[in-house]
């Protein structure tokens, strides 16, 4: 409880919410700010003082899939996350990166003389930012929707063909089985699945 060092604090010590553009009804961007820097998750931390403001889209429109790899239930499934596969998601990613740059170059942070490491100051155009978002983008570890819930009629027919569960969390086509975790969420809640 009273120790010091990087393992004694949460990885993200600051969070923020904002709109990618004024037309949004509510915040559709979230920042997780970490007092560290690294090239990518799982690699060693950089040895210089740094912060990493990670921005994410709270309402992505890209859709992936998860499928059984075989009839063996112990075999890992095939997963395609399909991040940033829609124009809307790419637009939000670019807007988030631009807002992040504006924050980091603000007068309030001027005395810290922040330097952009990734994607780097040579990345200037929207197209270049899109490419970097595709290159650098990753999960924030709150997946949902692999067993999406939706409206199902009395005959077991779903309005949305991707619906796997009815409104009572019952798995369509299987008796006596309910799914009651984040995989049942048809869309992701803003602010993470652990405490929206």
Q: What role is predicted for each listed range?
A:
Residues 2-196:
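FAD-dependent oxidoreductase catalytic-site/capping-region signature
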């Amino acid at each position: 409880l009273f120790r010091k060092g990087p393992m004694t604090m949460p990885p993200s010590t600051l969070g923020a919410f904002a709109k990618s553009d004024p037309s949004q009804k509510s915040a559709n961007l979230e920042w997780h700010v970490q007092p560290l820097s690294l090239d990518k998750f799982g690699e060693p931390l950089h040895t210089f003082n740094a912060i990493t403001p990670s921005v994410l889209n709270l309402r992505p429109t890209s859709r992936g899939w998860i499928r059984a790899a075989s009839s063996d239930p112990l075999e890992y499934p095939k997963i395609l996350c399909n991040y940033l596969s829609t124009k809307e998601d790419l637009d939000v990613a670019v807007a988030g990166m631009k807002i992040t740059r504006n924050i980091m170059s603000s007068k309030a942070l001027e005395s810290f003389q922040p330097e952009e490491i990734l994607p780097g100051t040579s990345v200037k155009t929207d197209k270049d930012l899109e490419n970097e978002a595709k290159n650098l983008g990753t999960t924030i570890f709150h997946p949902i929707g692999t067993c999406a819930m939706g409206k199902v009629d009395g005959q077991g027919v779903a309005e949305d063909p991707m619906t796997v569960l009815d409104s009572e969390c019952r798995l369509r086509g299987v008796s006596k089985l309910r799914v009651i975790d984040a995989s049942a969420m048809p869309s992701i809640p803003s602010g993470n699945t652990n405490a929206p």
